């Protein structure tokens, strides 16, 4: 059975956990902004692309993907908005993996 071609915008431990749960037949490309992000993804069944991309870079890199899962850090709002916009242009399914808000208890 042929799997999906998935792009994961990494940058959190949730991205690593997500990739670990994806079926082996899926072809996963993880996008990490830094070399440190790449080291966190070592040992996962994915290809890792390192470096910050602008909208044109994502337009090129995401062509041919079946879906994009944005598991970037909550503070990485620029990459989230850029990827969301590019996915809309390419009519590519976009999913945001979010974190639950933690409220400080006093």
Name every feature range the model reports, one short phrase each.
Residues 59-106:
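Glycine/small-residue-rich loop that forms an oxyanion/phosphate-binding "nest" at active or ligand-binding sites
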Residues 27-32, 48, 91-96:
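Short hydrophobic/aromatic-enriched beta-strand-loop microsegments
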Residues 11-14, 52-54, 73-77:
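Short beta->alpha connector loops
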Residues 44-62:
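Glycine-rich, highly charged phosphate/nucleotide-binding loops
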Residues 17-18, 39-40, 57, 78-82:
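Phosphate- and divalent-cation-binding pockets in alpha/beta enzyme and binding domains
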